[in-house]
Amino acid sequence: MNAATPGAPIRAEVVIVGAGPCGLFQVFELGLLGISAHLVDTLKAPGGQCTELYPDKPIYDIPALPVCGAQELVDRLMAQIKPFNPTWHLGEEVVQVAKRDDGRFDVVTSAGTAFDAGAIVIAAGVGSFQPRRIGLPGAEAFEGRQIHYRVK
């Protein structure tokens, strides 16, 4: 991985948006090709929907595994990608992507992390876990007191 100089974007071969099972498996596939990756996810830990919403749920559609728990799947993927040493950017949301004339991408996260990326893989699944707010005028005045949102 190329370390960025202060204020300069991180030069990355690939930025993967989403650290759920698909994003983790993408690290593995890229690693087999000798391509390093940066993973960006809004959650504070890898695993996406599997670990955030249903870690104990049995999964039946993984090739060569008749049944596998959601957390077990994530643990196996984490072990599988360990040799490829991805760079993690957890608790960050991609807020800006722009394709440049030279074919590379400028990517910026909610934490201000900036990338100069050769490619972007969108493995965001259902997207970031953010509540769908009530669309009524004035409802925001009651948020946190009488209107509460939670995703989990």
Question: Where do the language-model regions lie?
Answer:
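Beta1-alpha1 glycine-rich phosphate/pyrophosphate-binding loop at the start
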Residues: 6-87
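FAD-binding core/adjacent interface of flavoenzyme oxidoreductases
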Residues: 1-17, 32-33, 88-152
